[in-house]
Amino acid sequence: MIRIGAHMPIGGGFKRVPKETYEIGGNAFQIFPHNPRQWKANLPKEEDIKLFKEGIKKYKIDPEAMLCHSGYLINIASPNIETWNKSLELLILEMKICSTLGIKYLNIHPGSHLKSGVENGINQILKALNTAMEKEKNTFILLENVTKKGGNIGSTLEELKLIIDKAKFPDRLGITIDTCHAFDAGYDITNKEKLNEFLNKIDKYFSLEKLKFIHLNDSKNDLGSNKDRHENIGKGKIGSEGLKVFISHPLIQKIPWVLETPGDNDVHKKDIQEVLKILEVK
């Protein structure tokens, strides 16, 4: 069975997420654990937790297809000690929120070294991950591939490998592959041969077991553009044919897909329908 969904709103509480996931035709989802544009976060209230978990059971959502996405302000690669400390503190709280909700996976962007260099940035990331994962032992952190702009770390599989190889708790680290980010970073996932090379490299560096989620997005920009601007399914430079190559691969079909395309739930419902149409799923 294909597991597919979208990034879902949480305004008014987490309890809304399972039902709305079902209503858009999904059986997987991603959420923010708090307002992503604020440093402040709170643990959810007991009633919200209860209703959320009841909804998960009611709508039969696989726990392996539930994902939290870290807030936008966190930068655990930062050379600025104040920013790094605030990022670490919020990351730990996000892990607690995930654990409270019964969500196993937290997706994070590795961060930007802000001109301090990749090596220094990776060292900062490792310090943060090691500290956070020592304190919160229930959460599995997924490093998302990004585009190479603004000092971002993780635009290549090699950089993600460096982090996981040196981490204190590699067994609780995995990766998320974002199709827009991969395409914009120069990985041609629209070509069968190149896609196989990409997946073989993932298997060689991490094992495919480490690939836990796909962010399924089209791209507004060309291959290798390093822009990172998501587009709705079939309307971008990856396109329907390119996405068909990617999502038709049997290994990709084993992994949950989450859409982060522009628009609200109604738009995401149409995007999910478009994905299934591309796959020729009735």
Curated annotation (Swiss-Prot):
Protein name: Probable endonuclease 4
Entry's Gene Ontology molecular function annotations: deoxyribonuclease IV (phage-T4-induced) activity; DNA binding; DNA-(apurinic or apyrimidinic site) endonuclease activity; phosphoric diester hydrolase activity; zinc ion binding
Cofactor(s), names only, from the UniProt record: Zn(2+)
Claim: Zinc is one of the keywords in the record: yes
Annotated binding of Zn(2+) 1, by residue: 69, 109, 144
Organism in which the protein naturally occurs: Thermosipho africanus (strain TCF52B)
Top-level taxonomy: Bacteria, Thermotogati, Thermotogota, Thermotogae, Thermotogales
Database matches in InterPro entries: AP_endonuc_2, AP_endonuc_F2_Zn_BS, Xyl_isomerase-like_sf, Xyl_isomerase-like_TIM-brl
Keyword terms: DNA damage, DNA repair, Endonuclease, Hydrolase, Metal-binding, Nuclease, Zinc
Role of this protein: Endonuclease IV plays a role in DNA repair. It cleaves phosphodiester bonds at apurinic or apyrimidinic (AP) sites, generating a 3'-hydroxyl group and a 5'-terminal sugar phosphate.
